[in-house]
């Protein structure tokens, strides 16, 4: 599974990229909203992990562009942020497929929780889309 990780914080981007790669995912990265759109259109990711506070274009703007473009509208987008419940619900209404609380994923004692959380999200997204459990692409 190819994941586009959109995160402007270089240390956090490196940490999460490494954790996802160790879990068996192929990872491509973008550090701002504009490059996220370019990589989503040309990099053919299976899923996008999208931070909300980005330079050049905000996460919500990126989400709106992704969901209005025929080339990217069907790519699942998982929001990574620490937004309020109201803002989270608005993003889901605008097309985000799921949400991961950034603070809950912070490495604890050297353990990055993103790969495990992502597997749960992928299962939820596939259930919503009617994909049978046996066809869920989970890497271990």
For each feature predicted by the language model, list its residue ranges.
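CheY-like receiver
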Residues: 107, 111, 120-140
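Conserved acidic carboxylate
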Residues: 7
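The feature encodes the CheY-like receiver
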Residues: 55, 73
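Acidic, metal-coordinating helix/loop segments flanking the phosphotransfer/catalytic sites
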Residues: 29-47
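Active-site residues of response regulator receiver
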Residues: 51
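Two-component/phosphorelay signaling modules centered on CheY-like receiver
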Residues: 10-28
């Amino acid at each position: 599974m190819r994941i586009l990780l959109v995160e402007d914080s270089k240390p956090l981007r490196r940490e999460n990229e490494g954790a996802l790669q160790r879990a068996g995912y192929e990872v491509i990265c973008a550090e701002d909203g504009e490059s996220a759109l370019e990589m989503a259109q040309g990099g053919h990711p299976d899923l996008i992990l999208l931070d909300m506070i980005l330079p050049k274009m905000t996460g919500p703007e990126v989400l709106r562009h992704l969901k209005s473009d025929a080339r990217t509208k069907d790519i699942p987008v998982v929001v990574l942020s620490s937004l309020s419940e109201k803002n989270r619900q608005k993003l889901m209404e605008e097309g985000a497929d799921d949400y991961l609380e950034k603070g809950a994923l912070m490495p604890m004692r050297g353990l990055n929780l993103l790969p495990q959380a992502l597997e749960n999200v992928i299962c939820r997204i596939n259930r919503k889309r009617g994909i049978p459990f046996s066809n869920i692409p989970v890497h271990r």
